[in-house]
């Protein structure tokens, strides 16, 4: 007889909401990475590409947890992408997405704690910690732009030109 772990329906709902956030973030960071690379801001683009991949790893962990509970990972619904049209807007859009994700993960971790689902709580707390690092990074970038100006900030991130076949 096979034992299937059934999860609290609200926990699975939180996991799917988190999955939606992460899937949206994958696409948003990837598109922003492509914009930055296209604008010649290759050093900055590398960071955004790495963030997109990290969001994919988050989505994978959430999917794994949903399946553990014999739930259905909903990958068909995304939130609207927040797309920046310039460097500062990209940072602001990504910061808004990260703040939204952090709030969801904080709420979800609290619910999971009350439901005595400590493993899922720990997953949400780990995701929240990662998002807080992203938030700190993005806020620092906006602070730099405010202090040194957008022109100097973008000049700092032009890189990868030597030997590039672009």
Feature map (PLM): residue ranges:
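Iron-associated oxidoreductase/ferritin-like identity signal
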Residues: 1-166
């Amino acid at each position: 007889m096979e034992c299937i772990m059934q999860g609290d329906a609200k926990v699975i709902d939180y996991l799917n909401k988190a999955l939606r956030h992460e899937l949206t973030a994958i696409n948003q960071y990837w598109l922003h990475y492509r914009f930055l690379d296209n604008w010649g801001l290759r050093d900055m683009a590398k960071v955004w590409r790495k963030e997109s991949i990290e969001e994919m790893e988050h989505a994978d962990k959430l999917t794994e947890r949903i399946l553990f509970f014999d739930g259905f990972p909903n990958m068909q619904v995304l939130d609207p992408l927040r797309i920046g049209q310039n460097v500062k807007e990209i940072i602001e859009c990504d910061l808004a997405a990260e703040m939204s994700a952090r709030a969801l993960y904080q709420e979800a971790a609290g619910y999971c704690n009350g439901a005595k689902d400590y493993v899922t709580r720990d997953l949400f707390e780990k995701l929240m910690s990662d998002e807080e690092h992203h938030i700190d990074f993005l806020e620092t970038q906006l602070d730099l732009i405010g202090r040194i100006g957008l022109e100097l900030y973008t000049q700092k991130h032009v890189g990868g030109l030597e030997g590039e076949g672009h």
